[in-house]
Amino acid sequence: MHEYALLLLSTALVNNVVLVKFLGLCPAMGVSKSMDAALGMGLATTFVITLAAAASWMLEHWLLAPFDLGFLRILSFILVIAAAVQFTEMAIRKMSPALYQSLGIYLPLITTNCAVLGVALLNVQQGYGFFKSVLFGFGSALGFTLVLLIFAGLRERLALASVPAAFAGAPAAFITISLLSLAFMGLSGLVAT
């Protein structure tokens, strides 16, 4: 049990996919202008990453590795991710049309979010079993959502502040996410590798 909690904590905080591995920066910058959109995108991405981690583990261990089809890994993982995103998009459109509208183009772009593919490929590289792979995907997705929410909150506060014209918009966002990355770097001693 301790091992699972440690894996979840380390993937969410210490080895964060956005701030340590630099995966998923595009949606982090694009959807983080409001807390509602960031929460919706974070939850949708959490579902997709967790589902993709489970599906890619099964695909790798039941089809690709036994038949020596490793050269099809990236292509097959992208197809699995696209199917998971389509399922998520249909569910969000049906359950919450307002959230579907607020996410806009970023919802179908989860398919091309490098964090989703990166987590699936890292799962294969780490060699985890099924449960640990799903937990790794879920922890990575929680870390992505956490960064998205913190960054959205900081950007909302920054929008109310008087920022010099030279730093308004993207420069302030990049400075903010770099400071957030430094804050998360302080957690690096939390889990021994």
UniProtKB/Swiss-Prot annotation:
* Pfam families in the record: Rnf-Nqr
Where does this polypeptide localize?
Cell inner membrane
- Give the main location: membrane
Report the GO terms under cellular component. plasma membrane
Membrane topology classification: Multi-pass membrane protein
According to the lineage, what is the superkingdom? Bacteria
State the coiled-coil residue ranges. none
Q: Does the keyword Electron transport apply?
A: yes
Question: What keywords tag this UniProt record?
Answer: Cell inner membrane, Cell membrane, Electron transport, Membrane, Translocase, Transmembrane, Transmembrane helix, Transport
Sum up the protein's function in the record's words: Part of a membrane-bound complex that couples electron transfer with translocation of ions across the membrane.
Mind telling me what this protein is named? Ion-translocating oxidoreductase complex subunit A
Which taxonomic lineage is given here? Answer: Bacteria, Pseudomonadati, Pseudomonadota, Betaproteobacteria, Rhodocyclales
Gene symbol here is rnfA
